[in-house]
């Protein structure tokens, strides 16, 4: 069973490698480790995980869905947690759900629209 203690050990091992990078940093490296989280079920759980990371001076990217049956990204509580994560240095991105879409032009348009909406709602730019 997953525990925060186990996760801290994973983070410690990654830190020892010196390979931790965000998406922009990875573009300039031959070797890197990117930590990312696709948030499928719980903003609250992602928030707790981000606190563990911050306690170890670790940064990763959290991808949230605009349309999700498990959470409402725009509830006041969820927005406050996500804004706090961003303010504490975590990267926030869009976890796009195709929901049956197949037209690439429409998909690109929808991704851009969702990123713009989230940027407006959160008050910071969503670029990932």
What does each model-found stretch correspond to?
Residues 1-128:
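Catalytic alpha-helical scaffold of carbohydrate-active enzymes acting on polysaccharides/glycoconjugates
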